Swiss-Prot record:
This is Large ribosomal subunit protein uL23. The lineage of its organism: Archaea, Methanobacteriati, Methanobacteriota, Stenosarchaea group, Methanomicrobia. One of its GO terms (molecular function) is structural constituent of ribosome. Keywords: Ribonucleoprotein, Ribosomal protein, RNA-binding, rRNA-binding. GO terms for biological process: translation. Binds to 23S rRNA. One of the proteins that surrounds the polypeptide exit tunnel on the outside of the ribosome. Pfam families: Ribosomal_L23. The keyword Ribonucleoprotein applies. The gene is rpl23.
Length: 82
C-alpha cells in the first residue's frame, strides 16, 4: 500500500515548484522514510528532503524537495498539474 494519497494543489504549492518542491497528502501513519521510498518508486526521482506536518483537519501533508533541479516540474507534468 502506498503512503501517498494525492498531490496537494494550491497557489502556494504551485509557487513551490520553482524551488523544486512538491506537496502531497499522505497517510497519517506513514513516516518520512516510507514517504521517500514510495515517491522514488512511483516517480523515479531521488528525494533530497521531506518535511511533514499534520493539518488542523487531521490530514498529514508532506513537502518533498528533489535533488535534480527539474524533477518537481517533470513530476507535476506527469500527474497533470501543469
Amino acid at each position: 500500500m502506498s503512503s501517498i494519497n494525492y498531490p496537494f494543489v494550491t497557489e502556494k504549492a504551485m509557487m513551490l515548484l520553482d524551488e523544486n518542491k512538491l506537496q502531497f497528502i499522505v497517510d497519517t501513519r506513514s513516516n518520512k522514510k516510507q514517504i521517500v521510498e514510495d515517491v522514488e518508486k512511483l516517480y523515479g526521482f531521488k528525494v533530497k528532503s521531506v518535511r511533514t506536518m499534520t493539518t488542523m483537519k487531521g490530514t498529514k501533508k508532506a513537502i518533498l524537495t528533489f535533488e535534480d533541479p527539474e524533477s518537481a516540474h517533470e513530476i507535476a507534468t506527469r500527474i497533470g498539474l501543469m
